Amino acid sequence: MEQEQDTPWIQSTEHTNIQKRESGQQTQRLEHPSLTRLMDPYPRTMNRADTHKQIVSWRQWLSLKNPTQGSLKTRVSKRWKLFSKQEWTN
């Protein structure tokens, strides 16, 4: 079997394949999550926490691969907004 790079879409596909194997359905290896969603006859519902984790891991991976001034500004401004919201609610 070939060595694969440790990339987010392969990780998420691997996770999907493991879930399908456990439920006894036929597995199909796909390289990208959007293809998995299109081809899967029983789409999984993701809760908000799972979706957020997936988005965060993608952003971290992308920023590690190609950090730009814009991505740093976005990260800082989002953290500031979250912090200021917490201040208002407390």
UniProtKB/Swiss-Prot annotation:
Plays an important role in promoting lung pathology in both primary viral infection and secondary bacterial infection. Promotes alteration of mitochondrial morphology, dissipation of mitochondrial membrane potential, and cell death. Alternatively, inhibits the production of interferon in the infected cell at the level of host mitochondrial antiviral signaling MAVS. Its level of expression differs greatly depending on which cell type is infected, in a manner that is independent of the levels of expression of other viral proteins. Monocytic cells are more affected than epithelial cells. It comes from the Viruses. Is not encoded in all strains, and seems to be dispensable for replication. Oligomer. Interacts with human SLC25A6/ANT3 and VDAC1. Interacts with host MAVS. This is Protein PB1-F2. GO terms for biological process: symbiont-mediated perturbation of host apoptosis; symbiont-mediated suppression of host cytoplasmic pattern recognition receptor signaling pathway via inhibition of MAVS activity. The record marks 66 as: Low pathogenicity. Keywords: Apoptosis, Host cytoplasm, Host membrane, Host mitochondrion, Host mitochondrion inner membrane, Host nucleus, Host-virus interaction, Inhibition of host innate immune response by virus, Inhibition of host MAVS by virus, Inhibition of host RLR pathway by virus, Membrane, Modulation of host cell apoptosis by virus, Viral immunoevasion. Residues 65-87 are annotated as: Mitochondrial targeting sequence. Residues 17-34 have a biased composition (Basic and acidic residues). One of its GO terms (cellular component) is host cell mitochondrial inner membrane. Its main location: host cell. Residues 1-45 are annotated as: Disordered. The gene is PB1. Signal peptide: none annotated. It is found in: Host mitochondrion inner membrane; Host nucleus; Host cytoplasm, Host cytosol. Residues 1-16 have a biased composition (Polar residues). Belongs to the influenza viruses PB1-F2 family.
